[in-house]
């Protein structure tokens, strides 16, 4: 189609014309619908009229798009739209007039009026309106009291085209009456609006305003409707003017509920966001809250959330359940209903915690912890300790312990009454989670530690006596609020003033106790309106100083809390950018408030002291500890308090981060600052660096601390004040100072100092709990102190264990504090009752502590696990001296670990505290090598690493733990233990069937990695010697030395951290297990050679550590042998390539050298070798002989003995040296003679047989290996050794053993076939007679099924017939062997039968029939020889057999002159290169045989048709005749065998791209196809041309290409 288009014609013209036509059609339809609608409206058929109007409005011409715009506009369409909307508006007008009655609802009236307005206003968009439209709209706007809409509508009407003359001098008499009415309305409207207009002035100037007081005519019914609208509008205005009261309902008088309600009324905003500029969330409310009324549903007194009594409804830290329900009833429904709050579920905890606790709760098995209890009491009694109570004294139902010390009952009371308060106590000292990562390596400690330490609230006074904020105050406040109907903003102001201002000399903020939630909500509200309050009170700050001080204190408390959060994040390595930004903002607010508060001059001592203390707290948080302002402020406070000798305690019961204080506390703070200055100024003028300066500070501090507990650490007089201060200091300050020193040694990993100071700190904790003061405290205070002690205990215990683990649980360097064991026992018996008392009780239906407080219970469990870890470590030390005299105590330690593990795993926390219990348990269990210990170790292995040992599923319980990574420090002793336990005095290789520990050993070895790559001089030296040995040449001297135990590789012991594990045999045993698994997979044809790489590394590492195991060398050689076997087994490609074959030879050389070194190490101490070692050396001897046999015979042909082997190994990246390979392969230089190799093979096999015979006599073996005798006979059968008798004797022995030790179902036939073939060859060579051969075979019991007559030759026959009979008997015997081959893998008997038939009996046909069983030349697949390697055939030999079979088959075909079969076989050889050895030689022979057979069979004349004939035929005639032959090949009467041979020959030429087949192809074509056809058509006989004619013509000679083109065309047509 042409792409031409007219210039004056748009490509979319047809579409535009179609759209125009559619539009015109729609316009006609719309006018028709409009007329029909008017007729229905005229007849008052409102339903039909409405349907027609709806249909009209749905037309595309009328309907606007979704944006209210119209895509097309014209005068006709605009007029149509105007009429449609105008008359639709009057349709609703008439419908309303018709349907209106007094009973009509206001909603219906308003709905119809709005439809009228909507349609009429829309009509104004499309045309100028008529008077009726303006009149109706003006009346409706007037009823809606919208004067501005009236004014806009009238002015729009005056400005249209019909009215413009009104303002250009038109006389009053010429104005229409309707327009006069509009003018009158407009003038009156302006008067009502008290406005003026340009239009008004023009109207007045022209005199049109006179006598225009005409009233519009209004329908009476419509007038009533308008009056009703006016009334509705008036009601709405009045409703809008009334206040919108927001009701808040409370169940009872409760401050927390009220504040939570006020906070939830506003949008949710985080506290940090309130520090910004636009801080008040009220600005984001959708509607204003004009008034608030608080309604209390009923006055009932209920228990408060933090009551001191035991309350079963206390909230755990994982749940948010509010006791006092708050409901709002405003239209927005911001609050949830009471039902929703009551049915609120617990906050989702992590999956790990949820799974763990539910597992114990849902357990149906009753659990008793009595075995664990008495296991500990038993061992403690042996060590002279006594339990403080009996197990029967623990009452789970009563949650108490009957004991002399009240502390045990206090701990159980904590578990029963657990609440948020208990959680805060437990985490008050350490907010950070315990991290298992290594501590920092730096030993420098910044003095910021002192600031953090001395800024803590260590001296806060008790505020228990402060009353909680009362309900009476709330009643008083709510009465005032409800009476005044306060705006929400006003309500917040009044609330702040009520709580923060001074009332009767007290501020409720400091004189009453609030709940934490109440304080948080007050703080949130304060931050919300802080700007407004500041603006309000800054002008009269003296009057409102109490409110200002309260806000100042609140902001400071928020700032200190924010600083704590920043420090916590930074210490955990987290980012705190947002917090730092908010810190800057809140500091600006505090500075602003401080600027006006500092201006207050007052005599109010209480206000002044509190302001100074708040400012002191601010300076502590925001400046350096050495800031002089700190001491200055404290001095001012101290002076004021001393002046009045005041004993007043200034409390801050609600601010968590502002300490309460009194005169004594101020004195203490001054002493703190003095002490800090002294610590900072230690060695102030020293010239040493900062690190040494810090060290001197810590040494000084350590000596001072030690002097407080021991007179042996006396210090100078300059430090007496500091000592006095420490002696009188409270517990927490002492503990923090000790912890400072303690962490220094933890970071240094100093086990001696760490354990010493840990003992001191532990004693400090225990003494605090055992002192008399503790017993005099109230229940809550005792619980608080107990939990704080637990919190302190948590980190120091965990760190102590980390140091012990890093030092491999070392004991000889420990300086244990005297009472450490008894103190650990004390803590243990405090914590132990939590196990039985938390057992789930489904009958009671109550939650246990573990179930309701998962986070806190995890902390308690972790503490318990750490205490158990250290206690077990101590008890083991105490029992070690007793175990030597009482071995039965071994089971006591095992029983202790077992019962402890069972007990704590019931609640699934045996891996808590970084798995410390599992690690100490593993360490203790590995001391004992018995079945009980191994059983427990299996359980530990599962819990720690999730290793499921084989066959142990019924013994090991799969506790819900998190698998840990194995470290080198742990894996070393574990690997030694497993090897020692599993094998003990047994030989790992001989007794390696049990591989239960294989997974663990594999992971241990993986953890070690490749030790040969270490940066260790001895390892590198040994590796060099090892690699040098594997590169050495194989010589006769090498074999001679190995049998004498001489010339071993010179290796040294590295004696590093792995030496002990290597001597124990960790790598050796793991390698044996991996090799055994490889053998299993190899038998099922699933193994890969790459799997041997890791096994080789294991044995190599064992050798490099000079373990002197001859087995490692043997197994390493075995690995190399498996690689060689795999390379020779699957494909012949690797033996067809020189480079690849050299790689195989290199691996084979390594295997032989490894075997030789194994023999060297064995024979070095042959007399001391055990029976198991003799069994191993037998295998080594057999493997060496077998590998030598593979190496020396085809296809490897002694390549590994070539001294130039290293130059033959060429990497794929350097193929340029391949010519060197060919050059060197021509004349190889061998390092050993063939006779030496054969002598070595015989010696190895003879020694192996000798060892086997001795082992058989000793009952250690049950049979001899027939394959050894078979191999010896094979070696003797070579041409270089003429030992006929030894050969027959050994093969006969092999047959005898094979018959004796094999079953009928799995009979071995190899030695019997070999015996027949050997005797046959010996007979052919004339070395044995027929009678001797049959006599020897008769002695083989394998053939006992033949009768005696079979073995006798018929002497009456001539010699030739006797030979024929003899060969027939050999064939019968071979057929019998084939019948016994169950796997049908034996191929040699077929070949031997065919060989005898052809060579001796000249029966080619039958010989080919037998060879056809193993050779297939006519099958469609590429497989030529169908054989596979039998079990006892050496690797690679089947490729040699394949070559031999093909060569023999070619001889048969050549003898039979079967050219076609030879050709087919030659074709298959090209695709069979990976299936046989020496493929090049076979191809050459097949090609020559094919050409020879074709030439002889078809009497082809060499070069007759390729040179002389082709040069003398006419080219045109050749083209003509050859084309006719191709087109009529069937009519050409060509012999079928000629075509077939030609096809094969051409395909061979095409496949090889060689000229070898040119003569055959051209001769067959011209001699048997072209020339006969030409002669049968004499009328077209071509004329021979002369030389002159040949020169005159351009193209007369036929080329080879021309001939082959026709041959190809002919061949392609053949089937």
From Swiss-Prot:
Residues 339-364 are annotated as: Disordered. PANTHER family: CALCINEURIN-BINDING PROTEIN CABIN 1-RELATED, CALCINEURIN-BINDING PROTEIN CABIN-1. It comes from Candida glabrata (strain ATCC 2001 / BCRC 20586 / JCM 3761 / NBRC 0622 / NRRL Y-65 / CBS 138). Has a role in a nucleosome assembly pathway that is required for the integrity of heterochromatin and proper chromosome segregation. Belongs to the HIR3 family. The keyword Transmembrane does not apply. Transmembrane segments: none annotated. The keyword Transcription applies. This is Histone transcription regulator 3 homolog. InterPro entries: Hir3/CABIN1 (IPR033053). The gene is HIR3. GO terms for biological process: chromosome segregation; G1/S transition of mitotic cell cycle; negative regulation of chromatin organization; negative regulation of transcription by RNA polymerase II; nucleosome assembly; transcription elongation by RNA polymerase II. Keywords: Chromosome partition, Nucleus, Transcription, Transcription regulation. It is found in: Nucleus. GO terms for cellular component: HIR complex; nucleus.
């Amino acid at each position: 189609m042409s792409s031409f288009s007219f210039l004056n014609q748009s490509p979319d013209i047809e579409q535009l014309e179609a759209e125009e036509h559619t539009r015109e059609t729609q316009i006609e339809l719309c006018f028709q619908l409009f007329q029909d609608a008017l007729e229905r409206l005229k007849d008052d058929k409102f339903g039909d009229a409405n349907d027609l109007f709806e249909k009209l409005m749905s037309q595309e011409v009328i309907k606007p798009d979704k944006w209210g715009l119209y895509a097309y506009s014209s005068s006709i369409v605009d007029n149509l739209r105007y009429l449609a909307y105008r008359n639709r508006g009057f349709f609703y007008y008439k419908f309303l007039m018709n349907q209106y009655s007094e009973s009509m609802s206001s909603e219906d009236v308003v709905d119809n009026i709005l439809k009228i307005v909507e349609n009429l206003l829309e009509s104004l968009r499309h045309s100028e309106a008529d008077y009726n439209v303006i009149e109706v709209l003006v009346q409706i706007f007037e009823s809606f009291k919208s004067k501005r809409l009236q004014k806009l509508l009238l002015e729009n009407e005056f400005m249209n085209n019909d009215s413009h003359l009104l303002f250009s001098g038109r006389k009053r008499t010429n104005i229409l009456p309707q327009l006069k009415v509009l003018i009158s309305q407009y003038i009156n409207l302006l008067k009502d609006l008290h406005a003026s207009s340009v239009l008004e002035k023009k109207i007045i100037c022209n005199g049109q305003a006179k006598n225009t007081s005409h009233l519009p005519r209004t329908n009476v019914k419509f007038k009533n409707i308008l009056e009703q609208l006016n009334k509705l509008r008036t009601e709405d205005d009045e409703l809008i003017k009334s206040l919108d009261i927001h009701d808040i309902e409370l169940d009872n008088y409760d401050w927390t509920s009220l504040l939570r309600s006020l906070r939830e009324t506003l949008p949710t905003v985080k506290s940090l966001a309130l520090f910004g500029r636009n801080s008040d969330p009220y600005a984001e409310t959708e509607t204003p809250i004009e008034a608030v009324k608080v309604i209390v549903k009923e006055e009932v007194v209920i228990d408060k959330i933090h009551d001191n009594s035991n309350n079963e409804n206390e909230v755990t830290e994982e749940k948010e359940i509010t006791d006092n329900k708050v409901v709002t009833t405003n239209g927005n429904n911001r609050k949830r209903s009471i039902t929703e709050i009551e049915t609120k579920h617990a906050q989702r905890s992590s999956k790990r915690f949820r799974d763990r606790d539910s597992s114990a709760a849902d357990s149906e098995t009753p659990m008793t912890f009595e075995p664990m209890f008495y296991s500990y009491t038993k061992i403690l009694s042996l060590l002279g300790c006594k339990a403080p109570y009996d197990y029967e004294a623990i009452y789970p139902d009563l949650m108490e312990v009957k004991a002399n010390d009240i502390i045990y009952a206090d701990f159980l009371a904590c578990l029963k009454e657990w609440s948020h308060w208990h959680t805060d106590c437990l985490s008050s000292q350490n907010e950070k989670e315990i991290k298992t990562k290594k501590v920092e390596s730096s030993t420098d400690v910044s003095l910021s530690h002192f600031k953090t330490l001395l800024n803590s609230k260590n001296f806060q006074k008790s505020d228990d006596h402060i009353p909680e904020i009362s309900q009476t105050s709330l009643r008083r406040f709510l009465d005032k609020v409800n009476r005044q109907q306060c705006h929400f903003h006003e309500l917040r102001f009044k609330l702040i003033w009520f709580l923060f201002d001074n009332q009767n000399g007290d501020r409720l903020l400091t004189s009453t106790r609030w709940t934490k939630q109440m304080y948080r909500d007050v703080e949130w509200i304060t931050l919300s309106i802080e700007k407004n309050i500041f603006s309000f009170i800054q002008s009269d700050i003296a009057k409102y100083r109490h409110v200002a001080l309260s806000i100042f204190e609140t902001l400071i408390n928020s700032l200190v809390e924010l600083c704590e959060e920043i420090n916590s994040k930074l210490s955990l390595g987290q980012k705190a950018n947002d917090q730092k930004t908010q810190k800057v903002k809140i500091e600006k607010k505090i500075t602003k408030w401080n600027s006006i508060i500092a201006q207050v001059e007052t005599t109010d001592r209480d206000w002044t002291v509190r302001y100074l203390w708040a400012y002191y707290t601010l300076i502590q948080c925001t400046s350096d500890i050495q800031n002089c302002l700190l001491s200055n402020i404290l001095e001012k406070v101290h002076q004021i308090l001393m002046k009045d000798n005041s004993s007043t305690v200034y409390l801050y019961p609600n601010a968590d981060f502002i300490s309460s204080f009194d005169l004594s506390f101020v004195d203490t703070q001054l002493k703190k600052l003095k002490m800090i200055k002294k610590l900072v100024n230690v060695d102030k003028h020293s010239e040493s660096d900062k690190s040494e300066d810090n060290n001197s500070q810590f040494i000084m501090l350590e000596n001072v601390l030690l002097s407080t507990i021991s007179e042996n650490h006396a210090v100078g007089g300059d430090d007496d004040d500091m000592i006095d201060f420490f002696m009188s200091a409270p517990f927490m300050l002492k503990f923090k100072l000790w912890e400072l020193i303690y962490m220094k040694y933890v970071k240094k990993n100093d086990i001696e100092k760490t354990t010493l100071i840990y003992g001191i700190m532990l004693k400090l904790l225990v003494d605090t709990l055992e002192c008399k003061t503790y017993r005099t405290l109230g229940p809550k205070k005792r619980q608080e102190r107990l939990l704080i002690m637990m919190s302190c205990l948590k980190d120091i215990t965990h760190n102590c264990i980390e140091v012990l683990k890093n030092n491999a649980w070392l004991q000889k360097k420990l300086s244990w504090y005297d009472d450490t064991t008894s103190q650990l026992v004390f803590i243990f018996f405090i914590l132990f009752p939590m196990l039985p008392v938390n057992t789930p009780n489904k009958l009671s239906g109550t939650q246990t502590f573990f179930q309701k407080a998962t986070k806190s219970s995890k902390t308690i469990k972790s503490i318990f696990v750490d205490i158990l870890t250290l206690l077990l470590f101590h008890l083991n030390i105490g029992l070690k001296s007793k175990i030597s005299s009482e071995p039965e105590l071994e089971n006591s330690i095992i029983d202790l670990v077992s019962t402890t593990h069972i007990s704590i795993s019931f609640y699934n926390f045996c891996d808590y505290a970084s798995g410390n219990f599992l690690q100490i348990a593993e360490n203790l269990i590995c001391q004992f090598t018995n079945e009980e210990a191994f059983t427990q170790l299996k359980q530990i292995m599962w819990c720690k690493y999730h290793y499921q040992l084989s066959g142990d599923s019924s013994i090991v319980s799969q506790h819900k733990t998190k698998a840990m990574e194995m470290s080198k420090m742990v894996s070393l002793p574990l690997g030694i233990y497993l090897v020692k336990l599993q094998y003990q005095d047994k030989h790992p290789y001989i007794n390696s069937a049990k591989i239960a520990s294989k997974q663990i050993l594999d992971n241990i070895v993986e953890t070690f990695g490749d030790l040969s790559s270490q940066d260790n001089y001895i390892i590198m030296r040994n590796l060099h010697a090892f690699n040098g040995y594997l590169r050495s040449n194989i010589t006769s001297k090498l074999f001679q030395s190995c049998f004498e135990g001489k010339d071993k590789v010179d290796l040294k012991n590295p004696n590093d951290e792995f030496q002990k594990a290597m001597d124990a045999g960790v790598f050796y045993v793991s390698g044996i297990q991996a090799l055994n698994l490889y053998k299993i997979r190899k038998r099922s044809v699933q193994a890969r050679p790459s799997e041997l790489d890791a096994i080789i590394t294991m044995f190599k590492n064992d050798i490099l550590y000079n373990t002197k195991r001859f087995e490692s060398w043997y197994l390493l050689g075995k690995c190399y042998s498996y690689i060689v076997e795999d390379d020779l087994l699957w494909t012949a490609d690797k033996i067809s390539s020189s480079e690849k074959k050299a790689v195989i030879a290199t691996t084979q050389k390594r295997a032989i050298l490894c075997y030789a070194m194994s023999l060297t190490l064995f024979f070095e101490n042959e007399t001391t070798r055990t029976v198991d070692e003799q069994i191993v050396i037998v295998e080594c001897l057999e493997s060496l002989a077998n590998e030598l046999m593979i190496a020396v015979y085809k296809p490897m042909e002694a390549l590994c003995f070539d001294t130039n082997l290293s130059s033959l190994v060429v990497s794929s990246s350097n193929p340029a040296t391949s010519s060197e390979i060919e050059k060197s392969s021509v004349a190889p230089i061998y390092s050993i003679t063939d006779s030496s190799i054969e002598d070595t093979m015989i010696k190895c096999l003879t020694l192996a047989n000798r060892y086997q015979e001795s082992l058989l006599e000793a009952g250690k073996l049950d049979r001899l290996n027939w394959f050894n005798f078979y191999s010896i006979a094979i070696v003797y059968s070579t041409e270089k050794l003429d030992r006929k008798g030894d050969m027959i004797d050994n093969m006969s022995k092999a047959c005898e053993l094979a018959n004796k030790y094999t079953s009928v179902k799995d009979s071995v036939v190899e030695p019997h076939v070999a015996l027949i073939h050997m005797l046959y060859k010996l007979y052919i060579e004339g070395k044995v007679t027929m009678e001797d051969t049959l006599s020897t075979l008769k002695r083989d019991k394998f053939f006992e099924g033949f009768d005696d007559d079979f073995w006798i030759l018929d002497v009456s026959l001539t010699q030739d017939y006797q030979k024929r009979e003899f060969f027939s008997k050999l064939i019968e015997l071979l057929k019998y062997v084939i019948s016994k081959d169950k796997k049908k893998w034996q191929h040699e008997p077929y070949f031997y039968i065919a060989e005898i038939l052809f060579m001796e009996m000249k029966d080619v046909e039958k010989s080919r029939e037998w060879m056809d069983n193993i050779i297939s030349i006519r099958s469609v697949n590429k497989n030529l020889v169908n054989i596979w390697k039998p079990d006892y055939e050496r690797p690679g030999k089947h490729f040699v057999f394949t070559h031999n079979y093909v060569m023999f088959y070619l001889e048969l075909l050549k003898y039979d002159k079967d050219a076609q079969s030879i050709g087919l076989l030659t074709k298959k050889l090209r695709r069979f290169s990976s299936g046989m050895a020496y493929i090049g030689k076979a191809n050459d022979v097949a090609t020559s045989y094919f050409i020879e057979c074709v030439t002889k069979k078809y009497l082809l004349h060499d070069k007759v048709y390729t040179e002389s004939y082709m040069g003398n035929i006419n080219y045109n005639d050749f083209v003509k005749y050859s084309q006719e032959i191709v087109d009529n090949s069937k009519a050409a009467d060509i012999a079928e065998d000629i075509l077939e041979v030609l096809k094969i020959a051409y395909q061979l030429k095409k496949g090889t791209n060689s000229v070898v087949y040119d003569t055959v192809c051209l001769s067959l074509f011209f001699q048997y196809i072209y020339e006969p056809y030409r002669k049968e058509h004499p009328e077209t006989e071509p004329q021979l041309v002369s030389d002159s004619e040949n020169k005159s013509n351009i193209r007369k000679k036929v080329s080879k290409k021309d001939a082959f083109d026709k041959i190809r065309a002919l061949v392609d047509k053949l089937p």
